[in-house]
C-alpha cells in the first residue's frame, strides 16, 4: 500500500507530531503499511524489537507510545538506511530508549542473548522474479532467501514465552502464513484501502501460547475518498493534520 499522508515534509521525509523521519537514504520510504503497524500493535512488556527498521519509523512510533523505562532495539541490514535511522533517532526525544544494530536478522537472532516481549516487522514481500532494478530496494523488499515463515520463526526465536509478534503483509501472503506457522494467531485485521474494495493487507499478531483469534477490519478511505474515523482514531497521535 503506497498511500501517503500530507504531513509537512523536510529533508526528504515526514514530520509527525513528536518526531521527524528522514528517508531519502532508505530504499523503502515512510508509508501507510509501517505507520499502520506501528500504531496498531498492542504494547506488552518493556523490551521491544523492530526487525528491518529501515528509517527507524516503527522504532520511533514505539518510543512515543511506550513508558520511559522501555527499551527498543531496531535491526537493519542496509548501511545507508542504518545511518539514516541512527540520525533520525539521535534527533528524536527518545535517543536513550532506542538502540540500533546493523546486521541481517539471521545473524542477529542467532547471536542475540536477550528475549523480547514484543517484536514488530514490516517484512519484505516481493517474491523473486520481479525486477525492481535497484539493489538497495531489492534488499529491502524481496523475499529472496527467507520466506515469510522463516522470518516469523526468526522473530519467535527472540520472543519471550508470553510475548507477541506483530506483522503487516499483503493479504494472500498473510493468509498463507497463518496456515504455515505453528504459532497461534491472536489478532487478524483486514486492511481495506477504500470502502467497497477487497482487503489488500493483513495486520497479524502471533503468540507462542494457544489463543482465539480476534478478527477485525480497518478501512482507510470512505466512498468520498476521505479518511475514515476509524483510521483517524488509530493514527491521531502521530499525524499533524489529525
Swiss-Prot record:
Q: Could you state a single Gene Ontology molecular function term?
A: tRNA (adenine-N6)-methyltransferase activity
This protein is called: tRNA1(Val) (adenine(37)-N6)-methyltransferase
The biological processes this protein is annotated with in GO are: methylation; tRNA processing
Reactions catalysed according to its record:
adenosine(37) in tRNA1(Val) + S-adenosyl-L-methionine = N(6)-methyladenosine(37) in tRNA1(Val) + S-adenosyl-L-homocysteine + H(+)
Q: Which residues form a coiled coil?
A: none
Q: What is its main location?
A: cytoplasm
Physiological role? Specifically methylates the adenine in position 37 of tRNA(1)(Val) (anticodon cmo5UAC).
Q: What's in the GO CC field?
A: cytoplasm
Fetch the PROSITE patterns from UniProt.
N6_MTASE
Name the keywords, alphabetized: Cytoplasm, Methyltransferase, S-adenosyl-L-methionine, Transferase, tRNA processing
Q: Is ATP-binding among this UniProt entry's keywords? A: no
Q: What class of enzyme is it?
A: transferase
What is any Pfam family matched here? Methyltransf_31
Signal peptide range: none
Is the keyword Glycoprotein assigned to this protein? no
Would you say which domain of life the source belongs to?
Bacteria
Q: What is its EC number?
A: 2.1.1.223
Q: Tell where it localizes.
A: Cytoplasm
Q: Which InterPro entries match?
A: DNA_methylase_N6_adenine_CS, Methyltranfer_dom, SAM-dependent_MTases_sf, tRNA_Adenine-N(6)_MTase, tRNA_adenine-N6_MeTrfase
The record's similarity note reads:
Belongs to the methyltransferase superfamily. tRNA (adenine-N(6)-)-methyltransferase family.
Amino acid at each position: 500500500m503506497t498511500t501517503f499522508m500530507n504531513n509537512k515534509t523536510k529533508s526528504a521525509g515526514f514530520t509527525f507530531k513528536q518526531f521527524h523521519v528522514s528517508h531519502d537514504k532508505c530504499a523503502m520510504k515512510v508509508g501507510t503499511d509501517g505507520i499502520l503497524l506501528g500504531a496498531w500493535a498492542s504494547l506488552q512488556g518493556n523490551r521491544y524489537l523492530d526487525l528491518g527498521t529501515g528509517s527507524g519509523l516503527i522504532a520511533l512510533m514505539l518510543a512515543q507510545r511506550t513508558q520511559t523505562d522501555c527499551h527498543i532495539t531496531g535491526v537493519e541490514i542496509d548501511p545507508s538506511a542504518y545511518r539514516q535511522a541512527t540520525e533520525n533517532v539521535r534527533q528524536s526525544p527518545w535517543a536513550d530508549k532506542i538502540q540500533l544494530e546493523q546486521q541481517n536478522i539471521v545473524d542477529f537472532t542467532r547471536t542475540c542473548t536477550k528475549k523480547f516481549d514484543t517484536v514488530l516487522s514490516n517484512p519484505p514481500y516481493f517474491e523473486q522474479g520481479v525486477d525492481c532494478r535497484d539493489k538497495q530496494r531489492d534488499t529491502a523488499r524481496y523475499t529472496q532467501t527467507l520466506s515469510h515463515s522463516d522470518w516469523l520463526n526468526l522473530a519467535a526465536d527472540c520472543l519471550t514465552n508470553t510475548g507477541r509478534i506483530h506483522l503487516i503483509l499483503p493479504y494472500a501472503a498473510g493468509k498463507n502464513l497463518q496456515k504455515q506457522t505453528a504459532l497461534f494467531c491472536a489478532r487478524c485485521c483486514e486492511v481495506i484501502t477504500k470502502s467497497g474494495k477487497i482487503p489488500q493487507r493483513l495486520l497479524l499478531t502471533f503468540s507462542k501460547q494457544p489463543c482465539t483469534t480476534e478478527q477485525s477490519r480497518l478501512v482507510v478511505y470512505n466512498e468520498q475518498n476521505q479518511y475514515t474515523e476509524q483510521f483517524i482514531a488509530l493514527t491521531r497521535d502521530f499525524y499533524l493534520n489529525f
